[in-house]
Swiss-Prot record:
Quaternary structure note: Component of the UV-DDB complex which includes DDB1 and DDB2; the heterodimer dimerizes to give rise to a heterotetramer when bound to damaged DNA. The UV-DDB complex interacts with monoubiquitinated histone H2A and binds to XPC via the DDB2 subunit. Component of numerous DCX (DDB1-CUL4-X-box) E3 ubiquitin-protein ligase complexes which consist of a core of DDB1, CUL4A or CUL4B and RBX1. DDB1 may recruit specific substrate targeting subunits to the DCX complex.
UniProt cross-references to InterPro entries, sorted A to Z: Beta-prop_RSE1/DDB1/CPSF1_1st (IPR018846), Cleavage/polyA-sp_fac_asu_C (IPR004871), Quinoprotein_ADH-like_sf (IPR011047), RSE1/DDB1/CFT1/CPSF1 (IPR050358), WD40/YVTN_repeat-like_dom_sf (IPR015943)
Keyword check for Calcium: no
Residue numbers carrying Phosphothreonine: T1125
Protein family membership: Belongs to the DDB1 family.
Entry GO CC: Cul4-RING E3 ubiquitin ligase complex; Cul4A-RING E3 ubiquitin ligase complex; Cul4B-RING E3 ubiquitin ligase complex; cytoplasm; nucleolus; nucleoplasm; nucleus
N-acetylserine: modified positions: S2
Region entry Interaction with CDT1 and CUL4A, spans: 771-1140
One Pfam short name: CPSF_A
Protein name according to UniProt: DNA damage-binding protein 1
Naturally occurring in which organism (per UniProt): Mus musculus (Mouse)
Record keywords: Acetylation, Biological rhythms, Cytoplasm, DNA damage, DNA repair, DNA-binding, Isopeptide bond, Nucleus, Phosphoprotein, Repeat, Ubl conjugation, Ubl conjugation pathway
Function: Protein, which is both involved in DNA repair and protein ubiquitination, as part of the UV-DDB complex and DCX (DDB1-CUL4-X-box) complexes, respectively. Core component of the UV-DDB complex (UV-damaged DNA-binding protein complex), a complex that recognizes UV-induced DNA damage and recruit proteins of the nucleotide excision repair pathway (the NER pathway) to initiate DNA repair. The UV-DDB complex preferentially binds to cyclobutane pyrimidine dimers (CPD), 6-4 photoproducts (6-4 PP), apurinic sites and short mismatches.
Length: 1140
């Protein structure tokens, strides 16, 4: 067996579909977006899109349509998944809780039938009498829409026309009527049929049209008054309704293919069209009123509006605003203007939604040397191509820094009474205090009257009645703002030194050894109210006011030396309300009361980087739900700050962390700074909404990223990136990319648009001694598109394209590696290519080119001709391993700097992927799954160890460990194969057993070892081992990690229990969704835990949690089994959430 945990680190971002309607209520205009398995529901407001709910479906959304049957006050949603689960959903809201109710559901799969090449088509009759589905060739499936039917029943009608391109229901017909484009040996034609529910068959339709344009691909049904249908082709747009036929062939649409459309007006007089190049058109239907008052179509007109992201779907919202959903680039909200701008465009982008898809390749690098990986992906395609830099955690963007060693604390001040913004920064050092004046972006040292500068400050700030306060080791000093003068001072009666202090706008608590004193701040007076003695010395304290307490805190939180406890005391009496023994020997160093998402918490940080956090009841002072995390290795200082009107906590240490709340769970996000000892929020004229941060040597002022888990930076390339690798010595990335050029009249080709490879700082072009240019069997014709491939050298800091190297005509760059070879000290970029000609079934020749980049120059060091396409290359024990068509070949690097073949392995169909570990090589084949080879250094050859005999069409492979191999195949499944070293017979040993099966529902393009999180966050009990990241076509980033058998069994038990408690949207069984499914077979999932389901445990209500844990046996590490509590599982699941 193999025990694995698979979880989403970034949900899919590519938009597959979008619809608008009135789903949440009759008044709301909603936008619904499908991102593969996720459904996002928005309300369209004057300010933009407001998210309402996100729903995870147990299936890939293939069809999504809103409709309103008679008698309904708002729209219902029909969804069909790729595994043929159909459901009708309704939105229900009661108070705060939002539910998506499944009104009806069923599976509409046929046992036999060939799935259509043009995919799944789902349509709804405008009168809501039926839903029509085209799933298989030669069959049209009908789901009658009866009011009260809970189960969706369907029947098939035979279609003589086997190859249907597109189909729609027509408007204004007595009986439901379909109109479709189909292909037969003579060409493409349009036909209509009436659907009879009673006879369950087709009747002759009102009209048909033979021999439409050969590329006709889309049907648009036009509402009344026009009725009929518009057929969209590559070169023409035609309108039919039986009586009338109108055709136009505007030259403007020929350049590219129209791929999506959307109706603007309810009466169908305007349609938006989007093409594959990201151009947006308006199709206008001009009307003509007849003598008898009827309206007929006079003319069709197409206008180019401008450019958007390459659209997968379009939907018109309101007031000239359109949502452009994209699969190949970022989605957009665009505004259509009445007048065009200087470039002649009517389109203005208002908002952009990040999409990582399609992730074609990626690599993990630790660019900031902090032990934390960043993921750099090759994302998007064509003009939407980009690199995306993804890191977990929060970035601080530095705006100013001053060399100031030894800072022990810092506070912002507003020095004058009327000021809204901070103008002063007070810095504390051992034995002294310094004051910095902020004037715009200038910073200068100054003195404040009434403040002392020869003592260390423990606290400083603005307090009530237009006063300032300074607490030093000697005294508490109250200073008036205008004029600046000391108005009151409090000292410990015996003159002892203050050791810790906390203050809010009207209260002060100071500790002198074991004694605590409570003071109140009045106009020009500090009034001592009470004092008490604790049994041990006070290590830290806090009186932050919570809730609506008018800035007064009724509670005081303290941490003590010696007994290592945290206590909540009542003010002013210092009565003990709660005592929490923290255990261990390490003293608490910082304590803080705070509120996240209207829940109150107590945070207590120890001197070794551990942090305890509790729920805090502000009425009773009681603590509950104790939890512990490890944030760093040094004493941690906790400070609050606000970002976008929410409170967050900054934990200063050698691993600075921002603590915030999401879905009422605390999230710990690391910050991209090496270490921070002290921080304070700063909001000055020159540095608005900033933070001031101090480490051992420097004071830095900066702004903080939006508080979220993953941060994504985009580097647009405007062409398609294919492969990426990182080269540390040159501090560069190598990227293979391709741009499209068009053959011009002179026989040369021109680029469609400026892009990374045409705008590099320097460039070079391949000239090869290996191939004479006359060998090209292919002549390109005028207007034909050709791909031009390049190696881009990109700076790791600025992401500037330093150099672009263009390959030969018809030469496609397929594989890339950065490595050292043999005893040669240089590091090379090595590219594998293929000469691609349309006439050849597979490439017959290619090259391996060795480049060196140094001192800003790219030099070709060596090239090697090969008889085929170099699909994959890896460095292998100082040699170069390459797969070329069906061969796996090992090259050694000679002292003459040439590649020499050492050995070959031939037993493959098409060897597309290579991964290595030690002397083992994993080969992923186009259709023959995976194969394990071992290299024998003594004999200098390959030995075939074992192979998986299942026919899996591979899309990516990875080695998990010495015995387990991970594969992804083209039906969206993951599997794990295991080497059976203990088998008794040779034959058994040669079989890789499939021990893990799982339906991911995503097409994986790339696996790589690495992690997005710091490697020591959380307690050491984290039950996972290793981390493999994967990137998919839909822009999802996931993670596979290995579990021990006992953890696997616990989580499997928990998964089964969760499936009983959590009701799936559309009533689709989790076990059905995750079962391994190809055209050949369906098998239940095994060897994988669905991490997304496990993590959803944290989002369910407490009673449901109790239901999940009832009688669950759990080993807490002592080796003894006991019944688990909800808190045990919360802790387990929170640990698991920290691996991504």
């Amino acid at each position: 067996m193999s025990y694995n945990y698979v979880v989403t680190a970034q949900k899919p971002t590519a938009v597959n579909g979008c619809v608008t309607g009135h789903f949440t209520s009759a008044e709301d205009l909603n936008l619904l977006i499908a991102k593969n398995t996720r459904l996002e529901i928005y309300v369209v407001t004057a300010e933009g899109l407001r998210p309402v709910k996100e729903v995870g479906m147990y299936g890939k959304i293939a069809v999504m349509e809103l409709f309103r049957p008679k008698g309904e006050s708002k729209d219902l949603l029909f969804i069909l998944t790729a595994k043929y689960n159909a459901c009708i959903l309704e939105y229900k809201q009661s108070g705060e809780s939002i539910d998506i109710i499944t009104r009806a559901h069923g599976n509409v799969q046929d046992r036999i039938g060939r799935p259509s090449e043009t995919g799944i088509i789902g349509i709804i009759d405008p009168e809501c009498r039926m839903i029509g589905l085209r799933l298989y060739d030669g069959l049209f499936k009908v789901i009658p829409l009866d009011r009260d039917n809970k189960e969706l029943k369907a029947f098939n009608i035979r279609l003589e026309e086997l190859h249907v391109i597109d189909v729609k229901f027509l408007y204004g017909c007595q009986a439901p009527t379909i109109c479709f484009v189909y292909q037969d040996p003579q060409g493409r034609h349009v036909k209509t049929y009436e659907v009879s529910l009673r006879e369950k068959e087709f009747n002759k339709g009102p009209w048909k049209q033979e021999n439409v344009e050969a590329e006709a691909s889309m049907v648009i049904a036009v509402p009344e008054p026009f009725g009929g249908a518009i057929i969209i082709g590559q070169e023409s747009i035609t309108y039919h309704n039986g009586d009338k036929y109108l055709a136009i062939a505007p030259p403007i649409i020929k350049q590219s293919t129209i791929v999506c459309h959307n109706r603007v007006d309810p009466n169908g007089s305007r349609y938006l069209l989007g093409d594959m190049e990201g151009r947006l058109f308006m199709l206008l239907l001009e009307k003509e009123e007849q003598m008898d008052g009827t309206v007929t179509l006079k003319d069709l007109r197409v206008e180019l509006l401008g450019e958007t992201s390459i659209a997968e779907c379009l939907t018109y919202l309101d007031n000239g605003v359109v949502f452009v959903g994209s699969r190949l680039g970022d989605s957009q909200l665009v505004k259509l203007n009445v007048d065009s701008n200087e470039q002649g465009s009517y389109v203005v982008a208002m908002e952009t939604f990040t999409n990582l898809g399609p992730i074609v390749d990626m690599c993990v690098v630790d660019l900031e040397r902090q032990g934390q990986g960043q993921l750099v992906t090759c994302s998007g395609a064509f003009k939407e191509g980009s690199l995306r830099i993804i890191r977990n955690g929060i970035g601080i963007h530095e705006h100013a820094s001053i060399d100031l060693p030894g800072i022990k604390g810092l506070w912002p001040l507003r020095s004058d009474p009327g000021r809204e913004t901070d103008d002063t920064l007070v810095l504390s050092f051992v034995g002294q205090t310094r004051v910095l004046m902020l004037n715009g972006e200038e910073v200068e040292e100054t003195e404040l009257m009434g403040f002392v500068d020869d003592q260390q400050t423990f606290f400083c700030g603005n307090v009530a009645h237009q006063q300032l306060i300074q607490i030093t080791s000697a005294s508490v000093r109250l200073v008036s703002q205008e004029p600046k003068a000391l108005v009151s001072e409090w000292k410990e009666p015996q003159g002892k030194n203050i050791s810790v202090a906390s203050c809010n706008s009207s209260q002060v608590v100071v500790a002198v050894g074991r004694a605590l004193y409570y003071l109140q701040i009045h106009p020009q007076e500090l009034r001592q109210i009470s004092h008490t003695e604790m049994e041990h010395e006070v290590a830290c304290l806090d009186i932050t006011p919570l809730g609506d307490s008018n800035g007064l805190s009724p509670l005081c939180a303290i941490g003590l030396w010696t007994d290592i406890s945290a206590r909540i005391l009542k003010l002013p009496s210092f009565e003990l309300l709660h005592k929490e023994m923290l255990g261990g020997e390490i003293i608490p160093r910082s304590i803080l009361m705070t509120t996240f998402e209207s829940s109150h918490y107590l945070l207590c940080a120890l001197g070794d980087g551990a942090l305890f956090y509790f729920g805090l009841n502000i009425e009773t002072g009681l603590l509950s739900d104790r939890k512990k995390v490890t944030l760093g290795t040094q004493p941690t200082v906790l400070r609050t700050f606000r970002s976008l009107s929410t409170t967050n906590v900054f934990a200063c240490s050698d691993r600075p962390t921002v603590i915030y709340s999401s879905n009422h769970k605390l999230v710990f996000s690391n910050v991209n700074l090496k270490e921070v000892n002290y921080m304070c929020p700063l909001n000055s004229d020159g540095y608005p909404d900033s933070l001031a941060l101090a480490n051992n040597s420097t004071l830095t002022i900066g702004t903080i990223d939006e508080i979220q888990k993953l941060h994504i930076r985009t580097v647009p390339l405007y062409e398609s990136p294919r492969k990426i690798c990182y080269q540390e010595v040159s501090q560069c990335f190598g990227v293979l990319s391709s741009r499209i050029e068009v053959q011009d009249s002179s026989g040369g080709t021109t680029a469609l648009r400026p892009s990374a490879s045409t705008q590099a700082l320097s460039s070079s072009v391949s000239s090869s001694k290996l191939f004479s240019s006359s060998t090209a069997p292919h002549e390109t014709s005028f207007g034909e598109e050709v791909e031009v491939h390049n190696l881009l050298i990109i700076d790791q800091h600025t992401f500037e394209v330093l150099h672009a190297h263009q390959f030969l005509q018809n030469e496609y760059a397929l594989s890339l590696v950065s490595c050292k070879l043999g005893k040669d000290p240089n590091t090379y970029f090595i590219v594998g290519t293929a000469m691609v000609y349309p006439e050849e079934a597979e490439p017959k020749q290619g090259r391996i080119v060795v480049f060196q980049y140094s001192d800003g120059k790219l030099q070709t060091v060596a090239e090697k001709e090969v008889k085929g396409a170099v699909y994959s290359m890896v460095e292998f024990n100082g040699k170069l391993l390459a797969s070329i068509n069906s061969t796996v070949r090992l090259y050694e690097w000679t002292t003459e700097k040439e590649l020499r073949t050492e050995c070959n392995h031939y037993n493959n169909i098409m060897a597309l992927y290579l991964k290595t570990k030690g002397d083992f090589i994993l080969v992923g084949d186009l259709m023959r799954s995976v194969l394990l080879l071992a290299y024998k250094p003594m004999e200098g050859n390959f030995e075939e160890i074992a192979r998986d005999f299942n026919p899996n069409w591979m899309s990516a492979v990875e080695i998990l460990d010495d015995d387990n191999f991970l594969g992804a195949e083209n039906a969206f499944n993951l599997f794990v194969c295991q080497k059976d070293s203990a088998a008794t017979t040779d034959e058994e040993r040669q079989h890789l057993q499939e021990v893990g099966l799982f339906h991911l529902g995503e097409f994986v393009n790339v696996f790589c070892h690495g992690s997005l999180v710091m490697q020591n966050l959380g307690e050491a009990s984290t039950p996972t081992q290793g981390s493999v990241l994967f990137g998919t076509v839909n822009g999802m980033i996931g993670l596979v990690t290995s579990l021990s058998e006992s953890w696997y069994n616990l989580l499997l038990d928990m998964q089964n229990r969760l499936n009983k408690v959590i009701k799936s949207v559309g009533k689709i069984e989790h076990s059905f969704w995750r079962s391994f499914h190809t055209e050949r077979k369906t098998e239940p999932a095994t060897g994988f835990i669905d991490g997304d389901l496990i993590e959803s445990f944290l989002d369910i209500s407490r009673p449901k949690m109790q239901e999940v844990v009832a009688n669950l046996q759990y080993d807490d590490g002592s080796g003894m089994k006991r019944e688990a509590t909800a808190d045990d599982l919360i802790k387990v699941v929170e640990e698991l959430t920290r691996i991504h």
